[in-house]
Amino acid sequence: MNIKKVLTAGAAVAIAMTLATACGSNSTSSSGSDTSGGSSSSNGSGTIALLLPDTTSSARYETQDKPDFTAEVNKLDPSAKVDYENAQGDASTQQQQAEAAITNGAKVLVVDPVDSTAAATIVTEADKAGVKVISYDRMISKAPVDYYVSFDNEEVGKLQGQYIADHTPKGGTVVMIDGAQTDNNALAFAKGAHDVLDPLFKNGTLKLGYETYTPNWDPQNGLREMEQALTKLNNHVDAVLSANDGLAGSVIQALSAQHLAGKVPVTGQDATDDGLHDIMLGTQSMTVYKAVPKEAQVAAQLAVDILKGQKPSSDLVNGTQDNGSGTPIPAVLLQPVVVTKDNIQDTVIKDGFTTMAKINNPK
């Protein structure tokens, strides 16, 4: 992964100030589609298709990405229209949704791929039709996408790996429950974690007892994997590197059945209310906070710039990413932050990302 630069915290704040915080959403079924915005594309500046991957790996897509993206587009260009679809974890469905969006006249596709490799076909079809593609959150592999908006995903894994390194006793056994192998981000998270932990595994400071990828990031798959790890290791587990909060919840469930919850460090990612609740309870140790509203707002800014035929500002596009296409992809890369019980107030609460009421009573 080739990242030339990463957005600093200060620049992220500047972007956040430039892009007003999203303030509204349009209701929709989680399995359906939604059309939001001002005039239709025939009367306005054009249509942006927002294609998100699922509703199971994280609650963020319905509760944050979709409403925040839509609100920002509406603010920046009230005449633009946002067509929203969720693939519910099916790559073929996402392909069909993309083709329909192109047929219906979308000028920009903002795609968070179900399958990073399969989604290359979406880029090919869009390119033939003169439609621009922004790869959102997850990178589409080996395809000439126009822009990429995400976080420094290897850094996410490094933060998780460093937490495990700092909080696991010498000689301790580590379990790694990674994300979906079809997700380029999951590969980056795992690589970042291994960059930190492999030297410790090699010199015997720590032991890697079990590692697996989790199909579709599905928490039920994660539960089975953690149960298998505990069985294989006879419950001799000293730390669990879990790729996100959804999987962390499954890890905690498996640990609880063996009376180990709260005794074993468990990592997470996404700063979900459930994950933060578990952190407050002491059963999850940390999460990696990614300011999703900022990510959605940045993607909206890029999409609107494309609709208007404007080149995005160099203050916005701050790096490049190698996705195997042979061409560096212009990228906006935001910085992730570790959240523990000690700094919840200074991070997710201070930013308005969530509230203690939601954390104490997650849905």
Where are the regions that the model predicts?
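A residue-level marker of the well-folded mature domains of exported/periplasmic proteins
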Residues: 2-10, 22-363
